UniProtKB/Swiss-Prot annotation:
GO terms for biological process: 5-phosphoribose 1-diphosphate biosynthetic process; purine nucleotide biosynthetic process; ribonucleoside monophosphate biosynthetic process. Its cofactor is Mg(2+). The keyword Transferase applies. Binds 2 Mg(2+) ions per subunit. It comes from Streptococcus pneumoniae serotype 4 (strain ATCC BAA-334 / TIGR4). This is Ribose-phosphate pyrophosphokinase 1. Keywords: ATP-binding, Cytoplasm, Kinase, Magnesium, Metal-binding, Nucleotide biosynthesis, Nucleotide-binding, Transferase. Mg(2+) 2 binds at D173. It catalyses: D-ribose 5-phosphate + ATP = 5-phospho-alpha-D-ribose 1-diphosphate + AMP + H(+).
Length: 322
């Protein structure tokens, strides 16, 4: 299969992932460079012709969030001015997704602002994974392909025989029940829910309140879309252990892991935390309890399907995991 009119570029956030995606597709990464001037301004240079090409930019808006977002916008502008046929952004992790509504008076809806900026810059399509709020897709007037990480996480546990009635998939809050139910369908397990109350005085902290469902004598698998400071997931794991769980595993699509996250995980009842590589983790963050699995095959398949105008629906098939 020839991909002579397909180009994949990497910016600063996920270079290793981009290399693996390019290998999956069977192409070379596009030649570009990013530099930052002493005053903080960013300059992006495209170092090959992309006239008439269908271009994909791979970049997560993880930390440093604002720099990574601005790199995308500048790159899109450069590609449009260089006569790219189409510009598609592959954003494995969509930053600002937690600011998807007005929770209090006079708050912004920043995830909508990000959508507006991407569209105004000239993005033709967005490919992303496990948005914190799925309805963010509705903030866009361009096509949004929203992939799921659950099949990859399910495959990890299934390969280790962690299926059936001895296991229970646990959502750390009410908002993640749909995600937990999906993983439970893959693994043929029951589900449980942690009922927690988040502190209104301190950001990124939460208090575990109650466990809904049977976990005593079971191996529990927690699943969330993202783990930030890891307070929620660690408190949930400790509560499950106190309730009689034999072992507690945890999983998420987006390992933000900011601040004291790795220390919290190390001290918690979590035996293993399984994460995807939507966000690059430096060596000091990859502690023994954390195992990272790659989304390169999933993204490569999705990019090829988009380029060839084939449906992405097979990537969501419960009976046919990635």
């Amino acid at each position: 299969m020839s991909f002579s009119d397909l180009k994949l570029f990497a910016l600063s956030s996920n270079k290793e992932l981009a290399e693996r995606v390019a290998q999956e597709i069977g192409i070379e990464l596009g030649k570009s460079s990013v530099r930052q001037f002493s005053d903080g301004e960013i300059q992006v240079n495209i170092e090959e012709s992309i006239r008439g090409k269908h271009v994909f930019i791979l970049q997560s808006t993880s930390s440093p969030v604002n720099d990574n977002l601005l790199e995308i916008l500048i790159m899109v502008d450069a590609l449009k001015r260089a006569s790219a046929e189409s510009v598609n952004v592959v954003m494995p992790y969509y930053g600002y997704a937690r600011q998807d509504r007005k929770a209090r008076a006079r708050e912004p809806i920043t995830s909508k602002l990000v959508a507006n900026m991407l569209e105004v810059a000239g993005v033709d399509r967005l490919l992303t994974i496990d948005l914190h709020a799925a309805q963010i897709q509705g903030f866009f007037d361009i096509p949004v392909d929203h992939l799921m990480g659950a099949p990859l996480i399910a495959d990890y546990f299934e390969r280790r025989g962690m299926v059936g009635s001895d296991y229970v998939v646990v959502s750390p809050d009410h908002g993640g029940v749909t995600r937990a139910r999906k993983l439970a369908e893959f693994l043929k397990t029951s589900i449980a829910i942690i009922d927690k109350r988040r502190s209104v005085d301190k950001m990124n902290t939460s208090e575990v309140m109650n466990i809904i469902g049977k976990v005593e004598g079971k191996t529990c698998i927690l699943i969330d879309d993202m783990i930030d400071t890891a307070g929620t997931i660690c408190h949930a794991a400790d509560a499950l252990a106190e309730a009689g769980a034999v072992e507690v595993y945890a999983s998420c699509t987006h390992p933000v892991l900011s601040g004291p996250a790795t220390d919290n995980i190390q001290k918690s009842a979590i035996k293993k935390l399984v994460v995807l590589d939507t966000i690059y983790l430096p060596e000091e963050r990859l502690i023994d309890k954390i195992e990272q699995i790659s989304i390169a095959h999933l993204l490569g398949d999705a990019i090829v399907r988009i380029h060839e105008k084939r449906p992405l629906s097979p990537l969501f098939d419960i009976e046919k995991k990635i």
